[in-house]
Regions:
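FNR/FR-type flavoprotein reductase catalytic core
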Residues: 1-83
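Short microdomains enriched in Cys/His and/or Lys/Arg
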Residues: 107-118
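Local cysteine-cluster metal-coordination motifs and their immediate loop/turn environment
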Residues: 56-61, 80-106
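Generic secondary-structure boundary signal with a strong preference for alpha-helix termini
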Residues: 66, 98-102, 117
Length: 118
């Protein structure tokens, strides 16, 4: 089931990809993304902002495709990593650059690095 699809369609141009083709494009979201970006003019590409959210492999793959067409400052990502305290004290969600997902995120520019093992 795809949650909030109708709500998203009210505020954005929505393109859906499902692995099994049960809704929208059949295949990986990165394939749909690349096809859509290839259709756009330079002016359209320059005005895009991406908000990636989901499992690490998908977010990193999407950001990689986006970087082929757009600048890093247009790409923001949130990855589902474990957070413990939620207020930045324990450091469980700290990435190698010191950013803490619980207080500096959840969306960070580019593709956030995996938190360091504690």
């Amino acid at each position: 089931r795809l949650y909030y699809l109708e709500e998203c369609k009210k505020i954005a141009d929505v393109h859906v990809a499902t692995d099994d083709g049960s809704e929208g494009y059949k295949g990986f979201v990165t394939e749909l993304l690349r096809n859509r970006l290839l259709e756009m003019s330079r002016a359209e590409l320059d005005n895009l902002v991406f908000y990636n959210c989901g499992p690490s492999p998908m977010v990193h793959a999407a950001a990689k495709v986006q970087r082929e067409f757009c600048r890093d400052d247009q790409i923001f990502s949130a990855i589902d990593y474990l957070t413990k305290c939620g207020v930045g004290i324990c450091g469980a969600c700290a990435s190698p650059d010191g950013k803490r997902i619980c207080v500096d995120g959840p969306f960070m520019q580019g593709s956030p690095e995996r938190p360091a093992a504690n």
